[in-house]
Amino acid sequence: TAAISGGIVWVPSNPSMQEKGISDSREDALAYFRSLDHGEMNDDSLEAFVDEGANALQFLTERGALDLHILNGYPDYYLDNPGAKSDGGRALDNALFDFTSLGDWSDKVYTGGEIVRMMLLETPLGGGSGIVDPEEMKRRVQGDLRGWGQALIGRLLKAALDRDIEILLETTARKLELLDGRIVGATVTHGGVETAIHARRGVVLATGGFEWDKELKTTFLRGPLTSPASPPTNTGDG
């Protein structure tokens, strides 16, 4: 889903805000979250996101996995809600990313049939004109420079490949492995074989949603969802 989205990263009190002296507070961020969650998120999850979000961005940026820039004046979506910021800062855009650096992995990132050669901040949505010099656009096309969600996922993928992190395609997550009340891994199906993968530090759930799985939609969503805008592979299993 992220690969065909605008790729905006939304984090309160993020490092870019701190560098530019844009004010934000833990209290405002939590108030904004709680005005939107319909009482369905627990405080531990909300507070962990607000308290550690900036640190997570700093960690990934220092390792080349992110290159983010403030979308000047890009407001929170629900401005009438408590804690909302009207002057921007929390929303971050991705610098263009060179997909040729991915080698054979460059065609593994889903495009949905469209590749954007601009940063969001260059478009009217991000405060820009939406116009790029033809010679510059030619350079971007020839160099396979991509923006938006493609840049976000491409850069994360490159950081993983640079560290020889094994990436399994066409792999379905089946269940989480528990030991003494702790999640220690996951059982997956890869190449028709069910395999247990053990984790030393934790398991990150980043499966992209489940809006194409009828059973999960019926179980977990409050109402019908008939026309998802995401890839049909979003079935909740990775």
Regions found by a protein language model. Name each.
Residues 5-6, 163, 182, 199-201:
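Short coil/turn connectors at secondary-structure junctions
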Residues 12-68, 158-159, 237:
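Conserved FAD-binding subdomain of flavin-dependent enzymes
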Residues 37-42, 187-197:
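A structured beta-alpha segment of the ubiquitous adenosine-cofactor-binding alpha/beta core
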Residues 1-31, 216-220, 225:
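Conserved N-terminal glycine-rich FAD pyrophosphate-binding loop of Rossmann-like flavoproteins
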Residues 143-150, 162, 190-238:
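Glycine-rich loop(s) and the adjacent beta-strand/alpha-helix scaffold that form part
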Residues 26-32, 121-133, 196-217:
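Short, composition-biased local secondary-structure segments
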Residues 50-191:
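Conserved redox-cofactor binding core of oxidoreductases
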